[in-house]
Design a protein with these regions (language model features):
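N-terminal secretory signal peptides that target proteins for export/translocation
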Residues: 1-16
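N-terminal leader/targeting signatures
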Residues: 13-14, 26, 35
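Bacterial N-terminal signal peptides
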Residues: 21-32
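Catalytic cores of phosphodiester-bond hydrolases, prominently lipid phosphodiesterases
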Residues: 34, 41-49, 54, 58, ...
């Protein structure tokens, strides 16, 4: 009889379904370490990776993050005006929702400080919002009959949708002039998403938009406290305020490996749609800070934002990035918005002046 050594014997009796996940875990752990190594040229603050229960669907006091102002270590690049958040821009309230370029985080829930594997962001939702992010791309899945946020597999991290939405509600309550957009990749029934929004207290804050109507001014959304716009790729239109993303938006391609491959070529959505999603992140084969630093550098991001309208005849409404604190995302958007809102303000003043002159005649 052939003698089997302990190691092969163990391998021979392990079920295949067990051996494969073990190999996957080893591979994931190796890549995770590699992707989260801090590179000197990325110019971004690193944070200690703590053991977090959020990535496993729980939220504890240990997961609380400090804002940049609390830490005194805010190295997120600001615009030339020193403005980080769009609310601080002159003319913000008089601009319409579709004439502001909003910074959006790709796979916003997947972040390093809360222990997610293969993260697309460094910080959690609250920190992102405090830093000036105003749009969140979230993947919604069902686990045991409940709506969760996860990306790819729950092994990489997960959090109940309601938990994330409650975090968003808390921020919006503290900042009454903030407009926020959620863009959902949704594998959950629309009823489950509605249930989570209602439990989090956000349902009453949702703006409803008819596709044939012009988007409202920011000031009107603030006065009516309808400051949350929700777009989804599944179940849109099933209830008021739950918008079909491809009825309102078009997007550029999102599978890009190097800066040279960035284009304005349309991927999904009708060309006539009113909102434009400018996907601006690199994946090779997963997201990483060095890749983000290249994509988010002002020499790359600024001309891409500014060239969007001339290339596509569409305003870059949602600029979607990984690791937003790498590079110059906030500075680039602040400078672009300041120029654009300034032009709109001058145009409005000129129109009022012409109207007044006509009345005098």
């Amino acid at each position: 009889m052939r003698k089997i050594t302990p190691a092969p014997r163990l391998a021979s009796i392990l079920p295949r379904f067990f051996r494969v996940p073990v190999s996957l875990v080893v591979l994931v752990a190796f890549v995770q370490v590699a992707m989260n190594t801090e590179f000197a040229d990325s110019q971004v603050i690193d944070v200690p990776k703590e053991s977090s229960s959020v990535a496993n669907g729980k939220n504890t006091a240990a997961d609380t993050e400090k804002s940049p102002t609390q830490t005194g270590k805010d190295q997120v690049a600001l615009g030339g005006s020193g403005v980080r958040c769009p609310e601080k821009l002159p003319g913000y309230r008089q601009a319409t929702y579709d004439r502001i370029a909003w910074l959006v985080t790709h796979n916003a829930m997947s972040n390093r400080v809360e222990g997610w594997w293969f993260p697309n962001q460094t910080y959690g939702i609250t920190r992102q919002l405090e830093d000036g992010v105003r749009g969140l791309m979230l993947d919604v899945h069902m686990i045991d009959g409940e709506a969760f946020l996860l990306h790819g597999s729950s092994i990489f991290g997960k959090v109940p949708l309601e938990t994330c939405l409650a975090e968003i509600k808390a921020f919006m309550q503290q900042h009454s002039d903030v407009i926020l957009t959620l863009i959902l990749e949704c594998y959950a029934p629309a009823t489950k998403v509605r249930e989570s929004l209602e439990k989090a207290g956000l349902l009453s804050m949702m703006h409803h938009q008819d596709s044939a109507d012009a988007w409202p001014k920011v000031n009107d959304m603030i006065k009516e406290d309808k400051r949350l716009v929700v777009l989804t790729d599944a179940g849109g239109g099933e209830w008021r305020g739950y918008h079909d993303v491809w009825e309102f938006c078009q997007e550029t391609h999102y599978s890009v490996k190097q800066v040279a491959d960035f284009t304005y070529k349309r991927n999904r959505g009708n060309q006539a749609n009113s909102l434009f999603i400018l996907n601006h992140f690199l994946t090779r084969p997963v997201a990483g800070k060095v890749l983000a630093a290249r994509a988010n550098d002002s020499s790359v991001l600024q001309p891409r934002i500014e060239g969007c309208q001339s290339a596509t005849m569409r305003f870059p409404n949602f600029v979607v990035v990984d690791f937003y604190e790498c590079g110059d995302t906030l500075a680039s958007l602040a400078d672009f918005n300041q120029k654009w809102i300034g032009k709109q303000k001058q145009k409005s003043q000129h129109s009022r002046h012409e109207s007044a002159s006509a009345l005098e005649k």
